[in-house]
């Protein structure tokens, strides 16, 4: 099984797979993680040492079974799962300063990177999670 996790954070995706009894050994089952926060990467490396860290999502692409990243190229064949939760600060209904940029905000526009890779990869399964948001952002996503 091949999993690509975007905005991986501390690898909550692997926690969920773990609870299902699925482990990533880096050989038969591979978990590729795109994350840029150093502390989150450190937590993942400690808890899931077989994770393949691929860096910044904006520098990831996929073509003909190859995953191209800032940390190298990987012959992966088909990707089974694309998972992730793009940054939400710009469109969350809980925005504290009451300024909402929607999906055009500096952080939340990374949603489009998820969408780009979803189209490139066409995985068997995908999961995009996020927060409760304003109606305008919901319309854009639909």
Task: Specify the residue positions occupied by each region the protein language model found.
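Conserved active-site and SAM-binding loop architecture
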Residues: 1-142
């Amino acid at each position: 099984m091949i999993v690509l996790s975007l905005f991986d954070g501390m690898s909550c995706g692997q926690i969920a797979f773990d609870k299902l009894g699925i482990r990533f050994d880096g050989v038969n089952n591979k978990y590729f993680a795109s994350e840029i926060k150093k502390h989150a990467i450190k937590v993942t490396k400690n808890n899931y040492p077989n994770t393949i860290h691929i860096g910044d999502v904006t520098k990831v692409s996929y073509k003909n079974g190859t995953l191209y990243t800032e940390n190298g190229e990987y012959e992966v064949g088909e990707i089974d799962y694309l998972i992730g939760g793009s940054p939400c600060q710009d469109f969350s209904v809980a925005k504290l300063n009451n300024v909402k940029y929607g999906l055009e905000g500096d952080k939340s526009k990374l949603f489009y990177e998820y969408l780009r890779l979803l189209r490139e990869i066409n995985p068997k399964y995908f999961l995009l999670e996020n927060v409760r948001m304003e109606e305008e952002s919901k319309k854009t996503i639909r």
